[in-house]
């Protein structure tokens, strides 16, 4: 176990992909006069004085539902106002939306009944498969739609929170402590430049500096990550005061310097440009040091290894800058120094600051930046790499998060926790304050809120969002609608937690204080560390701030070593009833589910600019692997103790349905996959999937399909997404349904029958394409077996369209066979339209010119049609013989859900 204190850091690789979006700087001259936005009645960087009377709701969609609670600083009745606003969808939109859902549900049931009465006995096997698929489609659609019946929007009122602070007993004393967790594993797949920008944005957040701490979990145990943090701590001494002085947004330097214009909200505009140039120059030098870390450490290690007094013990160690062996993993693996086998490490890089401000110095020759009026304190920063040994299941990210939870309890023990993936950063400096509006508002039921979830927003997704990376339909539609129930599921990043909820304690609404204390005293539940157990009641108290600075003496070191040990979880409740849930790939959803079934609530909220932003995989293969892990984890959740059907009465009925939908959605895609392969029948037989009597069938089908699209347009309206977002979501769902989701079902079946767990690879965020094109990854083809099923479906439907054209040409459009061929072709063309982004993706660089795809498709269809007309059409038999050989049409419908 390694413990140390330092004041510096370092990192490597890849220029961050940035979205330059939205903000403008208007600084006209050096004196900060005209055109400069400066807060007049409030200190720079303070929350806007405007109260959120209209917020996100003054439009033709949303209406406020709590007007009486917002009537000035004291609510008009001597009681504090709520710290957030709640909006509901206007009745003129909500009532028709609900009515259409009901009508479609009735139509689906009527359609099933009609099909049962009109069973096709000539194609019984097709009819049976079709009915099974359609029943599941209808059921799956209902699971997805019912939780959306009561969409609610909640908006944090930062001005009300500022009022509460101002009227508090000790200034900002009412803001409780926050521990911020960042997790990373591989410095190559998760480039270090992403990680260091994430940490820098956290250190510069607009939150009382003595009330939050930042923890980085390096699950790979690499010296590169540690020295990157050493460099970060050093550069933060310049970057953080600069951000505070000029109120810059965003506070991740890579994002900030990539923007061409920024809004200025500070008070010293005359110094902005010179300060900015100086800081940018320092940042470029910082990036050079980060980029060179791999080579720097390797050269240093080689030099030390050559100087071992001629001793050759067969080990080539990785050496730290102080001339000692790195206790984690080495470049050249050795016993106790390889992935999955190394000591635990806790390094305190920045100590907890004092409670009193410490102002910087005036500009001088040695220090050209004037920080004389700026608080230059930095938050606590800690590097952690938990112990790993062979023979132990380290539980991936969930295990790392639980180690962070235990270490932070001993060092800072803040009552609230925010977690980030290493490729996300703080995009809005007020982001830590916003969730406090929900956690601290007891009039709004804040005591029962386990976590606040922000949407995930991404930088540098291609302009057309080919692979639905923004996922706005899910975030701003499905997830937002859960606010009307117990709240959204936990989505893995950009989330603030209540520490008590992570410990598995019950919410105040359901649990008595005595039972909570009894739960804390159960040593078997939380492990052998008595110090950890005794800290839990303090950590669960939201009124407290943060643990005073801890002296790292021998007893604390032993406790830290104990709680990061690889076997600490064994025989305890960690991973099931406490902390993040184990043995499920989607540990985030399962952890949120555990809290909801205990009776906790959650809140989904967003803010402008977005609270957090991150990086999404724009490469087709990496995107498919990402949703493979999500869908596989969902199925693991269904076949585990986290099954929504097993939850108790504290889980809202519609919340139960929402979780059931989250854990079963991949199953329905098995039917979709086979539906998409039914066109093979066009190639090997003369059977069609058209139900008889055809007129009634067509009426039902058109009505059901039309209603789902109208319902979708209502959701587009109230969620604020675009039609393109909705279309991309439909397309990528079909892409997943033809390959990824059925593969996840197959993996789950193998796990159930063999008992072996499923290994899902880490989504790579590295860029392998040329640096001249930030979207080059979009046009890079990485051939993997996961692409094959969708390619087969694509080829089958292109062939089916060709056969349909050939049949229509051979028989004529006015014949029954010709009409059926054209009608069947409509289904095939629809499938091809949904798979269009996939087809572009596998074309690689040629995908930059969609016209090439259209020409190739037309040529392929024409070739199949000509071959069918030449070799497959029975011209020689005459019309009567052809009609006799054709046989009767079989039945099958398209999906009803």
From Swiss-Prot:
GO cellular component, one term: Golgi membrane
GO biological process: cell wall organization; cellulose biosynthetic process; plant-type primary cell wall biogenesis
Location(s), subcellular: Golgi apparatus membrane
Entry-linked SUPFAM superfamilies: Nucleotide-diphospho-sugar transferases
Keyword Acyltransferase among UniProt keywords: no
Record: active site: 219, 588
Positions of transmembrane segments: 93-113, 123-143, 664-684, 694-714, 732-752, 786-806, 822-842, 851-871
Enzyme class: transferase
EC nos: 2.4.1.-
Topology term for the membrane: Multi-pass membrane protein
Main location: Golgi
Name of the protein this chain belongs to: Mixed-linked glucan synthase 4
